[in-house]
Amino acid sequence: ELLSYLKTNKSVTGYGLDLDATNIEQCLQKGVNVIEHDLNRGLDSFASNSFAIVVMTETLQSVEAPDQLLLEMLRIGNECIVSFPNFGNWRCRLQIAMGNMPVSQHLPNSWFDTPNIHLCTCRDFEVLCKKLSINIIEKKYVNSQHNSSPLIKVAPNLLSAFAF
């Protein structure tokens, strides 16, 4: 959906990567360029500095080596935009305190069938970027409706559902 929006409204040329045949078919029906590719195999098939911007939307938590994938994204692109569900959100914390793994609109799967294998918080992501010497140019924290607020900005690790 993001690539379709960017293509239609911002005249962006881009490529999506996906493994799911249904998702690939939907992209093609919308006129979005898509390549069947497993992100867990890395991005070696792309030359360095191939793209101005590389975007990963709500996928970081489901890859085997998110740290290596971030470095690969920066190898093939000048900048990256990454979004992920914030596992530090108060609703997630409350469910854990009640003895359950979180299930919510932005984390809809039960613990036994989730594709999410590396859940992280906003703070965890920032620590990883610092460890990898990745400079975060801009941060945005939003609720489950993708809206920001002054309150979320005060305590993003606790109050945001997603981080960009």
Language model regions located:
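S-adenosyl-L-methionine-dependent methyltransferase catalytic module, highlighting the catalytic core
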Residues: 67-72, 79-164
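A short acidic, Gly/Pro-enriched loop at the edge of an enzyme's catalytic core
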Residues: 44-53
